């Protein structure tokens, strides 16, 4: 049975090459029949497929089951193979729904039938559309849990790499035999702009491979578009949309302060010119065109693009905004039958990122998704010039654009206005915050050979194998070498006294800058939005004194380093292989190498906040007793087929204003909380990743 799961994984290989070719480094051939051939290969496809099969190097042949009923895909086939795909476009959403429906409808455990259906879809559909729908189906079917989702950056490297790289990569693949180690292609750190553009100071963060993979993978686990409501309607999905993006904005603002920039300015006047320009320096290998740039001073314009299913005006958007603001002000939403329902944070999230879960899409619109579309089509709002969308409309590239953060700063402000309205959310009472009998006596961070309460960051170069995405080039690994931020591993040391009997407690760890842009102490009303959650975990407390230690690499926020920079094809004997197989669901976690903000060479003052909360108020009764498929990254990603593993509101205790404390010192005075000044210090050196393949 293992072979069939390997066969499914081969459908990710070289998405632009036809299926008549061999797949994978081992040259595996799918034996096609006439029903799988597209019109351009109708005359000679079987002959070519057989010719590949006669090659001595073919290691294995996969015989496909003929389908009794061939899927039609009337909508999805309308997307040309060389077009780019975006979930923000209504017409593309309909196409994706159609394909996902077909792949999900194959009878469970009929894996040969499913494989043939997927091969047919792979051959007949746009490669980006297929990859998205295929991955969503693989993640959500119960019989494909052993199929490993492949690293998107390895399959579509053009979404992550300077376009100049691919000429060098193909030359290396063609000239240097795969048996000889190939010198990695160096990706310069400053390839999209210079520091004359102040926003470019954040390019290392916005264009980080792991951060962009996180965003792409999160939206695979939590798709907003699917006909089957079960795929969308996961536990607390709307609230998680709020919290994950709120933490992205908080982390981005932390990085801005480290780079002497103000916090990001929300985009609230939708008719003003946009000063932020962005030139992505990316080419789409699917469409063989460059991604459209955005010049400084451009504005939103009414969208009239029938080909994309877009017909929406700025007036429409402003009306939707007023309706959402009214729902927040009254605490109620109006349903399609004119009745009302009490608004909560989960419902608001499903209104902002409109999906089948939106309570009234006609009234509240699709604001978040349309904000991406308006921002992506400023250069061609009427399809007059046949231009495609900008990077902000692709889940894998959207976080590269500085304007993404202005859009999401406004989105977060809407959620914060809900949290700050007492008729919607009441401030926490003392009993909701305290943990009777538990006293935190000290908190600290320690790293091997380093100063106590100092976190150390540095630059690292890591390699990614591009060969799976280099269509029509010779086989063998071709590596691109990225420079990215990293930090020295550290651990938290928390000392606590428990005057009651043995019990469990949830440890919640946050950090935030100690001062604002003007180097002044924060008001809690502002600093609470700057706290970034570093870890959350449950531990037993024995009676009396306790010392809790936790390694930074154990964080429930992050995915291991290997899941961002990994090549599954060489992991066969790796003892981590069982962990890597869990990438399908947990892969949407925050990248471990970006856990700590950059800091500065001189050191930036931060505050470490630790809370030991009352586990009796935290715990969740899961619907069944099945073992978890993975434990990492549950903070942003939840748990597969289970409830979110924390009963508290996401972001607790900083998700809402305090009715008594005005600063963090006052707020953290409760016995079950601890506060410690720490420093984040950057060592401005670049080190090679010891995991890189030998050159």
Curated annotation (Swiss-Prot):
GO terms for cellular component: extracellular region. Cu cation B binds at residues 368, 372, 408. The keyword Mitochondrion does not apply. The active site is at 353 (proton acceptor). Synthesized by oenocytoids, a type of hemocyte, and released into the hemolymph plasma. Activated by immulectin and lipopolysaccharide. It comes from the Eukaryota. This is a copper-containing oxidase that functions in the formation of pigments such as melanins and other polyphenolic compounds. Catalyzes the rate-limiting conversions of tyrosine to DOPA, DOPA to DOPA-quinone and possibly 5,6 dihydroxyindole to indole-5'6 quinone. Binds to the surface of hemocytes and is involved in hemocyte melanization. This is Phenoloxidase subunit 2. It comes from Manduca sexta.
